[in-house]
């Protein structure tokens, strides 16, 4: 049997299934840490000198591919009256129990995988790099301060500040600070008083709308594996793609994307960019857990094979 490779994610999730098949085709022994089954149906143990999946020690893993691990604050129902039923039953009476259990689960999984890294296992991507997907404003600041071209950005809960920003940059798009919803254009309907007051509930990220087309770039290690224009009639192309057009990045742009990946502490990324009509590229985000099967199927780009090479190297 060849090298042992771990996969963190749902055992039946498409990317986990696919990478398991690719790695086993290379002779690897693949161990799936099924995050969907833990803790109810998957035993994991952290000891002073060992990390165990069931009774199977994992410190001899050569590498781990982290496909999905929920690394954010657990959800809880803030307003218990929303759960009150006509008969008086409170649906969310035990929300604090669920909240605490999920918090414990996330803390355990995060420490479990990070400890494997401390014990010499190659982690792709390091759990700490997922911070910058959850902390999108910090990622933008890191990239901008390093000279990476990113959109002009304003995150605020102040309606007056938003109005001034919109006047300054013209066309504006917005999205949640932590992600989880599609990017949308700011319209006059968003700038009415009752709509703006919703910012008092939670801030949002507002950015200049960069004209041009969407480009997805996959990087593994220091290699740009593919760069593709994604055609869509919608601002947020996810799920609405109408075509894929592979392109060759200018060397300086390829170098810029690799540098951005490194700044974010990533070994593998799917980076989102905009290609402006004047030929300039603007980086939107580096994703630590990028989906790639659709791109492999649409363009034949060897993202999966290159990722397998990196895990086995």
Predicted regions and their residues:
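Short hydrophobic segments within beta-strands
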Residues: 7-8, 220
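C-terminal active-site "lid" helix and adjoining low-complexity regulatory extension at the edge
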Residues: 262-266, 275-313
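Conserved N-proximal alpha/beta basic substrate-recognition cap immediately N-terminal to
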Residues: 10-22, 33-149
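Phosphate-binding site of ATP-dependent enzymes
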Residues: 23, 167-261
């Amino acid at each position: 049997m060849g090298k042992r490779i771990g996969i963190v994610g749902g055992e039946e999730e498409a990317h986990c299934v696919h990478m398991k098949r690719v790695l086993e085709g290379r002779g690897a022994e693949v161990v799936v840490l099924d995050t969907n089954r833990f803790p109810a149906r998957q035993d994991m143990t952290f000891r002073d000198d060992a990390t165990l999946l069931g009774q199977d020690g994992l410190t001899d893993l050569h590498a781990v591919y982290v496909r999905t691990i929920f690394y954010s604050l657990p959800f809880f129902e803030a307003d218990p009256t929303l759960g009150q039923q006509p008969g008086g039953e409170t649906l969310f009476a035990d929300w604090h129990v669920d909240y605490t259990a999920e918090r414990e689960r996330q803390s355990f999984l995060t420490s479990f995988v990070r400890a494997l890294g401390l014990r010499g296992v190659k982690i792709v991507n390091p759990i700490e790099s997922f911070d910058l997907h959850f902390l999108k404003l910090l990622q933008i600041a890191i990239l901008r301060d390093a000279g990476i071209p990113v959109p002009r950005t304003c995150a605020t809960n102040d309606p007056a500040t938003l109005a001034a920003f919109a006047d300054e940059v013209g066309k504006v798009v917005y999205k949640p600070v932590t992600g989880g919803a599609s990017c949308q254009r700011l319209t006059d309907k968003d700038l009415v008083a009752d709509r703006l007051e919703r910012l008092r509930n939670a801030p949002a990220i507002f950015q200049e709308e960069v004209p041009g087309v969407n480009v997805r770039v996959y990087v593994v290690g220091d290699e740009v594996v593919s760069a593709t224009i994604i055609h869509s009639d919608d601002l947020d192309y996810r799920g609405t793609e109408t075509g894929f057009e592979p392109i060759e990045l200018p060397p300086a742009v390829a170098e810029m994307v690799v540098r951005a990946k490194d700044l974010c502490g990533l070994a593998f990324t799917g980076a989102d960019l905009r290609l402006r009509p004047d030929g300039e590229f603007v980086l939107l985000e580096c994703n630590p857990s990028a989906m790639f099967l659709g791109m492999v199927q649409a363009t034949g780009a060897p993202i999966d094979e290159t990722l397998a090479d990196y895990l086995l190297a």
